[in-house]
Amino acid sequence: MADDLDFETGDAGASATFPMQCSALRKNGFVVLKGRPCKIVEMSTSKTGKHGHAKVHLVGIDIFTGKKYEDICPSTHNMDVPNIKRCDFQLIGIQDGFLSLLQDSGEVREDLRLPEGELGREIEQKYDCGEEIITIHGARFTTS
């Protein structure tokens, strides 16, 4: 579903990321690993050794592709954290390959195409069974 959405929009002057000290990151939070916005699924810290700072080992899953990334950084260094926006919509219909989604504001959004493949079939099946909530994660994020 992420392939069909526009994640390049945001408020004027909004930054794609903000810095956070590595030691302040937490599991289930977000971080940029290898240039990709990831959700942190594993995190461990090594003790300070005689040759430097404590190190933090991070394992994250790309929020758009599901690919796994890892990185190790000193606990005192800053890492980029992506600005993530989470939106819940009520799925009120599927017509001609597009989703009809009710926003919190009461407006209906009908510009999102039903994803192809397994994800699209799963959404249709859940809708047919009465599930109506769709969560969309968006990030104002660009790769260079």
Swiss-Prot record:
The modification N-acetylalanine is found at residue 2. It is a peripheral membrane protein. Signal peptide: none annotated. GO terms for biological process: positive regulation of translational elongation; positive regulation of translational termination; translational elongation. It comes from the Eukaryota. InterPro entries: IF5A-like, IF5A-like_N, NA-bd_OB-fold, Rib_uL2_dom2, Trans_elong_IF5A_hypusine_site, Transl_elong_IF5A_C, Translation_prot_SH3-like_sf. Its main location: cytoplasm. Transmembrane segments: none annotated. Pfam families: eIF-5a, IF5A-like_N. SMART domains: eIF-5a. One of its GO terms (cellular component) is endoplasmic reticulum membrane. It is found in: Cytoplasm; Nucleus; Endoplasmic reticulum membrane. The keyword Lyase does not apply. Keywords: Acetylation, Cytoplasm, Elongation factor, Endoplasmic reticulum, Hypusine, Membrane, Nucleus, Protein biosynthesis, RNA-binding. The modification Hypusine is found at residue 50. CDD domains: S1_eIF5A. One of its GO terms (molecular function) is translation elongation factor activity. The keyword Transmembrane helix does not apply. Lys-50 undergoes hypusination, a unique post-translational modification that consists in the addition of a butylamino group from spermidine to lysine side chain, leading to the formation of the unusual amino acid hypusine. eIF-5As are the only known proteins to undergo this modification, which is essential for their function. Belongs to the eIF-5A family. Translation factor that promotes translation elongation and termination, particularly upon ribosome stalling at specific amino acid sequence contexts. Binds between the exit (E) and peptidyl (P) site of the ribosome and promotes rescue of stalled ribosome: specifically required for efficient translation of polyproline-containing peptides as well as other motifs that stall the ribosome. Acts as a ribosome quality control (RQC) cofactor by joining the RQC complex to facilitate peptidyl transfer during CAT tailing step. NCBIfam families: eIF_5A (TIGR00037). This is Eukaryotic translation initiation factor 5A-1. It comes from Gallus gallus. The lineage of its organism: Eukaryota, Metazoa, Chordata, Craniata, Vertebrata.
